Amino acid sequence: MATYAVGDLQGCLQPLKCLLERVKFDPAVDRLWLVGDLVNRGPESLQTLRYLYSIRHSLTCVLGNHDLHLLAAWQNVERLKKSDTLREIIEAPDADQLLDWLRQQKLLHYDEPRGIALVHAGIPPQWTLGKALELAGEVEEVLRDDERLKLYLDGMYGNEPNKWSKNLGGVERLRVITNYLTRMRFCTGTGKLDLKSKEGLGTAPKGYKPWFAHKDRRSRHVKIIFGHWAALEGRVDEPGIIALDTGCVWGGTMTLYNVDSGEYLRCDCADDGTLRPPAQPTKLIDQP
């Protein structure tokens, strides 16, 4: 039995299947962890979601911002953008089945025996793992509640409040939790977010750092696997932090990480998110 984690798919099914074939992934015995952003912008969002649903019993995945955007469009609380490739999902005959399954997924997963957390964007420095799991659970509960789902999805968009406070309530509370777990890149040591900057490590606004770079980060004892930040190209220079979004949908690579051995496997992608020939994944022993 092996456990593999893969970076943002964004509807790029060919590279995922190429990687899984290379490691001889067997859904009957192996596990696949996904860091979110399963769909959108790539060429096969519907096919990707259908494939993941077909192996759902072997799958652990967390939701990313694009997945939440899909749920909002499905519930008619947000219009699709010109760059979105989600309409085929919403109009598919099995849309309700797929998206009802999608909204059951977590925002934060913790594998206690391994001491590993799986999240789309990250855990803010002022939260312990326990606090992050507790607050993620608040959003997860609403996503699974038919009566509160639309209200949450309608109110989740926006950059304010830009910092957590225990006094927050209602949709503002859920929005900042969501932004930390699915959109965060740079923040201050007290968790004030900058959600506009999207480039690499050396581009932090004054007073801000990558969320994982704060020396007093309270989840430092936990190994964290995340995606979301393609500009990092998998490089974080921080022990115990595994960045898996390597920009497949932008013509970069898709990265698979063996959770137990620490080995990486990468597959080159074309600008449209398909395989770039020759489709021979490259094995990497050490962190990129």
Swiss-Prot record:
Recorded GO MF terms: bis(5'-nucleosyl)-tetraphosphatase (symmetrical) activity
Coiled coil stretches, renumbered: none
Role, per record: Hydrolyzes diadenosine 5',5'''-P1,P4-tetraphosphate to yield ADP.
Origin species: Pseudomonas putida (strain W619)
Reaction(s) the record says it catalyses: P(1),P(4)-bis(5'-adenosyl) tetraphosphate + H2O = 2 ADP + 2 H(+)
Keywords assigned: Hydrolase
Pfam family for this entry, one: Metallophos
Taxon lineage: Bacteria, Pseudomonadati, Pseudomonadota, Gammaproteobacteria, Pseudomonadales
EC nos: 3.6.1.41
Enzyme class: hydrolase
InterPro entries: ApaH (IPR004617), Calcineurin-like_PHP_ApaH (IPR004843), Metallo-depent_PP-like (IPR029052)
PANTHER family: CYTOCHROME C5, PTHR40942
Protein name listed in UniProt: Bis(5'-nucleosyl)-tetraphosphatase, symmetrical
Similarity comment: Belongs to the Ap4A hydrolase family.
CDD domains, sorted: MPP_ApaH
HAMAP family with a match to the protein in the record: ApaH (MF_00199)
